[in-house]
């Protein structure tokens, strides 16, 4: 029987499956407890989503995504009224202001996702890409 891979996106850490931490043991930065704190302490311009990756009905991967809306930052473009600043502001607001990250934007390293060693990692990564 060919395994069926799927994903579920959770908007709150309180919605995460009970066995989430079984995979998060590799990094505290993906644990339910850490994600709950991250969710509560996130700045107003950032939203967190948590992705569960499933092989049939079994959780085989977990990931964190963050959406950052830089339009909400106060520090961009209020310095002066010259044409150069105006052009920069238009370009920034229309092309560079929405960022989707897989992982935590304040951490480096392997803290974006965890995949079970027992699963087909290529298929799980393809499923994460679809999410």
Where are these regions (language model features)?
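N-acyltransferase acceptor-side catalytic subdomain
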Residues: 1-131
């Amino acid at each position: 029987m060919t395994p069926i891979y799927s994903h579920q996106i959770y908007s709150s850490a309180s919605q995460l499956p009970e066995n989430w931490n079984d995979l998060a043991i590799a990094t505290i930065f993906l644990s339910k407890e850490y994600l709950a704190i991250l969710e509560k302490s996130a700045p107003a311009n950032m939203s967190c989503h948590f992705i569960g990756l499933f092989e049939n009905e079994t959780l085989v991967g977990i990931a964190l995504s963050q959406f950052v809306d830089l339009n909400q930052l106060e520090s961009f473009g209020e310095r002066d009224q010259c044409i150069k600043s105006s052009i920069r502001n238009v370009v920034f607001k229309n092309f560079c202001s929405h960022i989707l990250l897989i992982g935590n934007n304040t951490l480096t390293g392997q803290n974006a996702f965890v995949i079970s060693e027992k699963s087909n990692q290529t298929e799980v990564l393809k499923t994460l890409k679809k999410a």
